[in-house]
Regions:
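Helix-to-loop junction immediately C-terminal to a conserved catalytic motif
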Residues: 67
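Signature (C-motif/LSGGQ) region and adjacent switch/coupling loops
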Residues: 87, 107, 133, 141-144
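Conserved ABC ATPase "signature" region
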Residues: 111, 115-140, 192
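Conserved signature/switch motifs of ABC ATPase nucleotide-binding domains
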Residues: 143-146, 164
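Hydrophobic anchor residue at the start of the ABC signature
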Residues: 158
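Catalytic Walker B motif of ABC-type/P-loop ATPase nucleotide-binding domains
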Residues: 169-172
Length: 274
């Protein structure tokens, strides 16, 4: 129902122990709520939020906590109003590293989550066929991951995540290892597919331009221990076109986001696309 939060983090902190036994605080007192939005006709629609910050500021840690792959030291994480205690089908995750099973074909990789969750064979077949078409892998259903480019492997990862139709999609720098043109193509693909789903996306990057182009809101984090220093709304409408990156309003927002990062304590690196 309207007003419900899709994802909530309340006072979340997480520390680790270094190889030398020293405590390392990855994130400290993370707080945000992503509202479950509805269209005027009552349809559930998802938001696109981005976590932006220098390398090592805890962005990936936040995603892993929401995914249920790790647990916070303090604080509470809710997805669809339910406390996160472990992984679940309501959340899907796409990683930067290629994670396809090398012994399975493209179709078998996409089908994997459906199969282990005991979906009927015909439903699995239909979903896989549709997703292969949606992500632009027509003709590659029987190919193995080692024969695919990096961009194509990430298309497989996105399709595999979408197969279970999660309400929340977590993406950990999925395009970081791709060349500039392929990264742009994948951004376009992601926005198109996201626009056809009701999923909320939480996307990690350290590329300022990528964050602005994709997001409805940008959570800017400082260097470790990562803390959200500003929630930056992105005022541009949708659908979006890559040409907007050359406009004055885009450049003005880029400079504002960069100024937020410069004001933050600590050291780290962020990237501005060229």
């Amino acid at each position: 129902m309207p007003g419900k939060f899709k994802v909530s983090l309340h006072n979340v902190s997480r520390s680790f122990v270094s190889p030398t036994g020293e405590p390392i605080q990855a994130i400290h007192d993370i707080n945000f709520d992503i509202e479950d939005l509805f269209s005027p006709d009552g349809r559930d629609i998802g938001e696109f939020r981005v976590l932006l910050g220098p390398s090592g500021c805890g962005k990936s840690t936040i995603l892993r906590l929401i995914a249920g792959l790790d647990h916070p030291d303090t604080g509470e994480i809710l997805v669809n109003g339910v406390p996160v205690t472990g992984p679940g089908r309501d959340r899907g995750m796409v990683f930067q590293k290629y994670t396809s099973f090398p012994w399975l074909t493209v179709a078998q990789n996409i089908e994997y989550g459906l199969k282990i969750n005991h979906f009927p064979v015909e439903e699995r077949r239909q979903r896989v066929a549709r997703l292969i078409e949606d992500v632009g892998l027509t003709g590659f259903a029987s190919s193995y991951p080692e024969t695919l480019s990096g961009g194509m492997q990430q298309r497989v990862a996105i399709a595999r995540t979408l197969a279970l139709r999660p309400s929340v999609i977590l993406m950990d720098e999925p395009f970081g290892a791709l060349d500039a043109q392929t990264r742009t193509d994948m951004q376009e693909l992601l926005l198109r597919i996201w626009g056809e789903t009701a999923s909320t996306v939480l996307f990690v990057t350290h590329d300022v331009d990528e964050a602005i182009y994709l997001a409805d809101h940008i959570y800017v984090l400082c260097a470790r221990p990562g803390t959200i220093i500003e929630d930056v709304p992105v005022p541009f409408g949708r659908p979006r076109d890559p040409s907007m990156k050359q406009t004055e309003p885009f450049h003005e927002l880029q400079q504002h986001v960069l100024s937020c990062l410069r004001r933050a304590p600590g050291q780290g690196q962020v990237r501005v696309s060229v």
